[in-house]
Regions:
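Extracytoplasmic/cell-surface-exposed regions of Actinobacterial cell-envelope-associated
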Residues: 16, 22, 97, 119, ...
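Short beta-strand segments
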Residues: 25-58, 74
Length: 152
């Protein structure tokens, strides 16, 4: 995919800043393609661990998508003052199953927000990108007639 032309006022974030924003975000969106080829989005709380995103889950849609090996994405965003930002991690996910890696996750304080058994750990690795931009007032989007006969 080719890079889009720069947009005035949009700051492309460096990798360090992207990881810091991922660390600070209380939750993110895990994006997968299900078995029927449809996109699905799951809000999850997470932790940054060893250059990856880690979250807990139970058996079900997220774990099935991970097992399929399809590409995934993980997205966080926010607003700070008059600046908005977005960070996306695009890559692959795997269920943490090796004993050494499972023991290592014990040091990551990651308690699921939703009740129920969330005994599975998923790790997402990939390419990171992010951007920050000024929040535009709603008046910018006001659209009037473009000329005679144009819809209002």
């Amino acid at each position: 995919m080719s890079a889009a032309a720069p947009v005035p006022g949009v700051e492309v974030l460096d990798e360090r800043t992207c990881w810091e924003l991922l660390r600070q975000a209380p939750y993110g969106r895990f994006v997968v393609v299900d078995a029927d080829g449809r996109p699905d989005v799951f809000p999850v709380n997470h932790a940054v661990d060893h250059g990856s995103v880690l979250f807990r889950t139970a058996d079900g849609g997220k774990l099935a998508a991970v097992a399929s090996g399809s590409p995934v994405a993980f997205e966080v965003d926010g607003v700070s003052g008059d600046l908005a930002w977005s960070v996306v991690l695009r890559g692959v996910a795997h269920q943490v199953t090796r004993m050494a890696e499972l023991l290592d996750t014990a040091s990551v304080h990651l308690a699921p927000w939703q009740a129920g058994g969330k005994g599975r750990f998923v790790r997402v690795r990939g390419d990171l990108s992010g951007r920050r931009f000024p929040v535009t007032g709603s008046g910018w989007w006001a659209v009037g007639p473009a000329g005679p006969g144009a819809p209002a």
